[in-house]
Structures are given as structure tokens and as C-alpha cells.
Amino acid sequence: MQRTLSKVILNSGKNNLLKSSNLLNSNLLKATTTNIIGIKTINNNNNVNSIIGFKSLNKRYFTSNTPKVEEEDDEIAPDEAIKAEEKIKETERVIGLSEKLSFQTETQKILHIVAESLYTEKEVFIRELISNASDAIEKVRHTQLTNASMIEDASIPFEIKISTDEDNKTLIIQDSGIGMTKDEMIKNLGKIGYSGSSDFIKKLGENPDKASIIGQFGVGFYSCFMVGHTIKIYTKSATPGSKGYLWESDGTGSYSITEAEGVSRGTKIIIHLKPSSYEYSKKSIVENIIKKYSNFVGFPIALNGTTVNTIKPLWTLNKNAISEEEHKEFYQFLSKSYDTPSYRVHFSTDTPLSIRSIFYIPSQHMEKYGMGKMEPGVSLFSRKVLIQQKANGILPEWMRFVRGVVDSEDIPLNVSREHLQDNGLIQRISSVLVKRILKHLNDEAKSDPEKFNVFMTEFGGFFKEGIITDFKWKDEISKLLRFESSNGSTASKTDAVSLEQYVSRMKPEQKNIYFLSVPNRAVGLSSPYYEPFQLKDIEVIFLYNAVDEFVLTNVGHFGDKKIVSVESKEAEEFLATNQDKKTETLSQDEIDKFLSWVSTVASDKVTQAKSTTRSISSPAIIIDHESANFRRMLKMVEPGKQHETPKQVVEFNMNHPIILKLVQQTESNPTIAKLVIDQVVDNAFVSAGLIEDNREMIPRINQLLDSLLTK
């Protein structure tokens, strides 16, 4: 039952979801008008659409190579827009005879797998090729730093160029990296992986889940055969004196290598696209893919002459070198929102794991507006290359409100970078990150309690979800919970108490942390269950949400203090005693006789009648009953089922004036006595929250009023 309830209570407490719809509409309008300003579309004879004057909120990060246009100038010549695009040309020239070679038998099989079935999204071939290009440039950069004389054409800038051609249906990706010699081309492109292709095939046969083992072999380049019918590669090694070569293949089993002139240092890949993949010759589509997967690659990526990746990867920078404005704009880029984050966590470590991360915690969330459950807000990178957007498992589901980036070189990835091979490692990384975020929030709560209390009013539901669904973190999360208590003077959202604060204010003789579930503060302060604690100045936490009692029940203990409902029998350490006001009116025989009479005449609701000294102002009270919140959750689990209120053990204050007078009426006026005892019992049920519809009391109350007035 508890597991079922856990699924239901996560959606409780959302009665006011739509109260801010006007604000939401306003924000959406603001987002639309702020993000896109001054769009002008120009059509030339070739139906080329150019968007001029795009202004982004992230202007600090975005730059443009487009010539400056005066704001009042509404016209721009189509020819000028075309000239702004710099296309990569195939200017190389082959010399000599081609050498035709065959792929290894195993490599042919693997090539078919890669081209046809490995990747779930074809578009990732661009990510793979950019990642390879970045690696190649990094190699030549490192060599140039350590031994510049070993690098050919050291003055060539480190950059990745991409060119689209819709007329010829081609896509070209060129880098100024380390390049390849002829032997390296045969070694790297003629066979797959250094771990042994036969072993690779063997593992594929043993494991039906190709993605689980294929990451052990380097086959990223071959992803371009998913979209291309012919692949041409011009390459020249960075080693001084190296020759240039052309590698060409249609992926059917063989390839050719030919010496070529006019080849620049690095590698140029020309993909002649299949008809089913012509969309990758369109600039807009390729640009979106670059921004999706490779926005933070460490080297410039120019698409048709314009740099695309102009956003700084803040998680790689020194936290002290980043301004507040940069953080704000980076957060808005990640979250696609326009609020200011409440908190941020910039965390890096090299031991025991390599982690570079930055997290932002928003100031508001959309679930409360009825927008549906949010998706994970953290993206996973490896060396600044996107592995998974909205990554599952990096943070637990209850932390889905967090926005950010995690970059780790320790993550072993499959070749397509779409499945993680080592879930155990991901869990270790997740554990480190969750612990760091919770610690940061706890520190913030202590440094600025008022700000944190406002934050928890907005996001407290997510942390309560975490306690219910993620037992591992319940102790850490419980430190962040905030509740109103009997010590507060008002119902202010900033006048909340943590469990740690509660414990620090406990009486020396107090053993437990006490809570009371009530609809509101006024009901709590007037509750007969609170009365004995009020008399002894014992603080009681008030819970107003149905989920809160379930949350504290799951927490169980805070340190060595048990969390107890004041309505339970365990709360008897602070039972009020009315001995001082006690009058010796009733003998024990009279008490026993009265309790026996109650058990008989009220048997439809009372299983046992007992005497108590727990309450002073109320004639009767129910202890250890099924809570009203629990009953509400049962109804959510089984909405069509009738849940009858079970009989209860009712405890009577035998010194209360009503009870003293009622004892006398049991024999002299049994009709009135029956009406009174039924009302006293029902009042106890109401105080316990066990009666939701009080209308059945009305006829009885009318009878009592009539009897009173006819005397």
C-alpha cells in the first residue's frame, strides 16, 4: 500500500496550480518578444532565405560575421547575403595511380552494422565527425606546444570548417588537425578499432545488445556511411614533409588511396549524401545539430564561413572568473527560460572521479501551473561534446528541477555515445553530485534562512518526493525540510522551522519531535491534541498538506529523536494531567459503570471506552487513530471505493462537567443521555479528522436544542 500511495501523493497539494496563469502568459509573451527581434527574410532567384538582424538574449556569447547593418536600413541585397557564406571547395588534385584495397572481412560486417543499425538517430554522425576533428586538432596543438618543429604549417589556425551544398547534395567537414599518413589511413580507416575486429564480432554475437559493448572500439567515423553513398577523405599528416592523400569508398567492401596535391594539413571529409539524407545538405538543419551536440567543443566551428559555437562552456572555467551576468545568461541558455536562478553550484574534482559540473536551481517551476511533469534538466558531456541531453540517471528524478551540465572523461561510452556502458560509474558520479548539491543548499539555508524558506515554499514538494521515493537520501533531504510550528507568531512563509532548529529548542526532558496534521493554524492551536503540549510549552510542528505526514513518517527519526504524532499513544510522555482540578465526585464503580454503558449504547462507533487525564477542555478524545491524511490518500488510490470509518477506542475525561452531568442522566433520562453521548463521541471523531460530512449530526443537534428549550 505504501508503494502505491507514494505514486499518488506526489501529485497532491496542487490545488492552486492555475492561479498564476496570467503571469505565465505574460512570461511567454516576454520570451517571444525578447528572443527574436528584427527578423527579415529575403528571397533571391535561388530561393535562398537569409535571416538578417537576429538578436539573442545571450548577446554576450553570440558573435556574428555578418556585415553590420544600420538598424534603420530595411534592405540588403541578396547578393550580399550570398557572399557572406564561404563554402569549402574541392580544390585538391590527385596524382599518380590509385591503390585499391579491401576492408578486412570482419570490418565489412561491422561497417554494415554501424551504417544500418547502431545509431538510433542518424544526425549524430555530425557529432561523431566533429568530435574526431576536435581530437585531431587537440593532438596537433599538444605536439606544437611540446615540439613545434615537428608540425607542418604551424601557422594554420586551429578550427573546424563545415560546408553544406544543397545543389550538389554534399556535406564537407574539414579540420586543421594532426592528419594521417598513408599507413595511418590504412590502419585507422581500413580496419575498425585497435582491440581486434574479430573480438568485436565475437562480442556482438554473444551480446544481443550491441550498444553495451560496441563502445570499446573506435568506429565513429563510419557513422557517415549512414547518410552517404560515397565518402571522400583528403588528409595530410602534420609531420613535416608528409604527402597528401585521397581516401575514397562507397562502404561496400573496398576503398582506394591516391596521392593528391594541394591538400592542407589535417583532414577534409566529403560526404555525397544518399537521397534519404539530403536534408543534411541544408545549412539550417546542420546548424541546429551542431548547436545541439557540439556547442561547447573547444575549437571554433565555422559553418559556411560563420562561427556557430560561440557560447562559453562555463563549467570548464575558474568559478572566480565568471561574472554574475555570465551565469545568468548561461542559465537562461540552458533552461530556455528568463528567470534568475535562486542558487548555483559550480563543482569540479579530479579524484576519485574526473567531474566538471555546473548546476542552476531556478526561482520557479512550471509543474505548479499544471504544465506536466518536467523532464531531467541536466545534460551529460564528455570533453565538451554532448553525450545525452536531458540525461537520466545523472541526478535522481526528484531533482528534475535542477538545470545544468556534467562533463566527465571517466565515463566509458559506447561508440554512438548514446548508451552508457558502466551504470555503476554513473551511480557513483550521481552520488557525488547529489551530495554536493544538498550540502550547498544546506549551507545556503543557514546563511540566508529567509531566502531559503521562500525557495522551499516553491520547491519543497520535490524534496518531499525525494524522501518518499529515494530512501538513500532521506536523512540529507530531511535537513532541508521546513514547516510551520506552534512557536511561530504568524503563518508567514518565512517563519518556518527546520528539524534541526526544532531539536535545538527541545526541552531537556523531551524525547521526541512532535507534529500535528491539521487543515490550518487556527485548527491546530484549538485542537485538544495540542492542548497538553501547549500547557507544558512544548513546540509542535503543524502539517497542513496531506503528503507531509507521510513524509515525516518516512523520515522516522532525525538524529536520535523519533518523529511522533501528538495523536499517537507515543506522545504520552507529555500527557496533560487534570489532577489539580479533579473533584472526587465519581467513584471507581461509577466510572466503570459509565464506561460500560458507553460501550453498549455507542457500540456502532466505539470498540472500547476508557478514562483519561490527557485532555482538560474536551470531554472525549481518540488516540492512535487512522489519520485523516491517510484516509485521504486511500481515497486517491481507490477513488471509487467507499472507505467506512472504523470503530475507535474513545477515552473520556471523567472530570469534565459534561461527563459528570451525563453520568447522572444515564438512569434518570436515558433518551437525552443517548443523544448526548452520541454527540460527544462524534465530536471526538471530528477532532480526530475522522468525520468528513457532519450533516448527519444535524437531526440529533436539533433534538438536543429542542430538549433544552422545552425545559
UniProtKB/Swiss-Prot annotation:
Chief site of localization: cytoplasm
Free-text disruption phenotype from the record: Defects in prestarvation response, sporulation and in resistance to heat shock. When overexpressed, induces precocious aggregation, however, development arrests before the tight mound stage.
Pfam families: HATPase_c_3 (PF13589), HSP90 (PF00183)
Cellular compartment(s): Cytoplasm, Cell cortex; Cytoplasm, Cytoskeleton; Mitochondrion; Spore, Perispore
Keyword GTP-binding: no
InterPro entries per record: HATPase_C_sf, HSP90_C, Hsp90_fam, Hsp90_N, Ribosomal_Su5_D2-typ_SF
Binding site for ATP: 132, 175, 188, 221, 417
Keywords noted in UniProt: ATP-binding, Chaperone, Cytoplasm, Cytoskeleton, Mitochondrion, Nucleotide-binding, Nucleus, Stress response, Transit peptide
An example molecular function term from Gene Ontology annotations: protein kinase binding
Region of interest (Dimerization), ranges: 303-711
Family: Belongs to the heat shock protein 90 family.
Protein name: TNF receptor-associated protein 1 homolog, mitochondrial
